């Protein structure tokens, strides 16, 4: 099994190649860089380097996974365009992965907490938000992913008595921690303000999805913006 994964949804730009059966890092090699506004320049280079170093051609890939959002409008378009271009040209199935779920998975790897409050700074005084719990081997979303003002979540009330089991993760906590959890005596198990989604984590999440047959065709590699004021569709980038 060979899966190419990429993510350009936030300030972080990354690509990863998962080759099942290899021992190093669970068979995953990755390129990662915090580089706001440089994703379009970096992502194709990262992909080329990963494939070249592994001696893998695009036609050998079993699937392409990507961070489908939410996140930066431009970043999501870049990832979707690259994925569509490769998938269309080589008839490769696609696995869209939630960036908020990827943050939850990364937070779990860092803290072993199975309860994660994932928040990405959405600008415009809002956060992209999701409440995830790991049940068995699957992340379960409580409610729905949403874009919302931090003041409207009322976490101190809804999570009363549960603070010691929840981890807050993502850039939303760096920007709005005082509003997500105003001074109320409520505290989290941990707060990971610089926890970004990454292609490495997306590749890990994509393995089970591919085995279960949860893929979509290239035409359905669509970003999830959560905001409704996005009109243009990403243009495929052909490799």
Question: Residue spans of the language-model regions?
Answer:
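N-terminal beta-alpha supersecondary unit
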Residues: 1-68, 196
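Short, basic and Ser/Thr-rich N-terminal targeting/leader segments
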Residues: 9-12, 125, 219-220
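Surface "functional belts" at beta-alpha junctions
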Residues: 21-26, 38, 93-196, 231
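Residues at secondary-structure transition points
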Residues: 34-42, 73-77, 81, 98, ...
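Stable alpha-helical structural segments in soluble proteins, enriched in small hydrophobic residues
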Residues: 50-54, 89, 107, 202-210
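DPxDG-like acidic metal-binding loop motif
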Residues: 65-99
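Acyltransferase
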Residues: 190-239
């Amino acid at each position: 099994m060979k899966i190419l994964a990429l993510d350009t949804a936030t300030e972080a730009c990354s690509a990863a190649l998962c080759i099942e059966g290899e021992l190093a890092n669970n068979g995953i090699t990755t390129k990662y860089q915090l580089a706001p506004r440089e994703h379009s320049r970096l992502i194709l280079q990262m992909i080329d380097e990963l494939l070249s170093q592994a001696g893998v051609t695009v036609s050998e890939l079993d699937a392409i996974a990507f961070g489908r959002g939410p996140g930066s409008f431009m970043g999501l378009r870049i990832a979707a365009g690259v994925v569509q271009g490769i998938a269309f040209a080589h008839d490769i199935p696609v696995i869209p992965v939630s960036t908020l779920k990827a943050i939850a998975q990364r937070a779990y790897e860092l803290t072993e907490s199975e309860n994660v409050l994932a928040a990405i700074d959405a600008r415009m005084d809002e956060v992209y938000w999701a409440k995830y719990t790991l049940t068995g081997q699957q992340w379960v979303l409580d409610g729905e992913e949403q874009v919302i003002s931090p003041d409207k979540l009322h976490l101190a009330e809804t999570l009363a008595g549960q603070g010691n089991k929840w981890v807050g993760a993502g850039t939303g906590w760096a920007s709005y921690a005082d509003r997500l959890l105003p001074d109320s005596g409520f505290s989290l198990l941990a707060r990971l303000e610089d926890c970004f989604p990454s292609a490495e984590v997306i590749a890990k999440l994509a393995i089970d999805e591919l085995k279960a047959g949860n893929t979509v065709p290239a035409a359905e590699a669509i970003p999830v913006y959560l905001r409704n004021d996005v009109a243009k569709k990403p243009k495929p980038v052909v490799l």
